Amino acid sequence: MDFANERRAMIDLLVQRGIRDRRVLDAMAQVPRHAFVPENERSFAYSDQALPIGEGQTISQPYMVALMVEALQLAPTDRVLEVGAGSGYAAAVLSRIVAKVHTVECREALAERAVALIQALGYTNITVHIGDGTQGLPDYAPFDAILVSAASPWVPAPLREQLASSGRLVIPVGGRQAQILLRLRREGDTLRTERLCDVRFVPLIGGHAWTAERYPER
């Protein structure tokens, strides 16, 4: 399969769907999404859809990754926290735009797989942490931007607290079936919140989001 042509077609689709930040488009043109999906899903790697990656998790559709990264309004010197590393794909995209990416994954198997892949692909400005991403990473805070790649019933307090002055936080917030993508921006002592669009994500599991006790039964 000609992944290079498939990737170019994906970028063309992102432009058609309204992605305008050239840095985001260039980053996604550089990162081999097919490397981040299971071998049996690789023929769909550059289609605009979420794909299973194991452990009940998915790699987000390319448009959603582009939309969320664009919404962060990143600068080259930014330090970014991603909550929900998953396959490591979004962290790889972020790493092509900013100085440093910290990404947290609560599922050890996914985290270990992401570490191996990130190292194999030569991304040197990404650190993968295993743990509860809803706690953030206080030892590395504050962050210029925080991207949450799973849905929470609310904005976790530790993430709000770890946002730098003028920092941006993009997160899906809502119930089990549907959420709203929010962007929060720190302005002095306040956080200004914008509603971006309706979305549907896998649940964010952790002490400050969904837990086994809190998460609604099927």
UniProtKB/Swiss-Prot annotation:
Root EC class: transferase
EC numbers for this chain: 2.1.1.77
Major location (coarse): cytoplasm
Catalytic residues, chain numbering: 60
Pfam families for the chain: PCMT (PF01135)
Superkingdom: Bacteria
Catalytic activity: [protein]-L-isoaspartate + S-adenosyl-L-methionine = [protein]-L-isoaspartate alpha-methyl ester + S-adenosyl-L-homocysteine
Function: Catalyzes the methyl esterification of L-isoaspartyl residues in peptides and proteins that result from spontaneous decomposition of normal L-aspartyl and L-asparaginyl residues. It plays a role in the repair and/or degradation of damaged proteins.
Matching PANTHER family: PROTEIN-L-ISOASPARTATE O-METHYLTRANSFERASE, PROTEIN-L-ISOASPARTATE(D-ASPARTATE) O-METHYLTRANSFERASE
NCBIfam families (UniProt xref): pimt, PRK00312.1
Protein name: Protein-L-isoaspartate O-methyltransferase
Organism from which the protein derives: Roseiflexus sp. (strain RS-1)
Gene name of this polypeptide: pcm
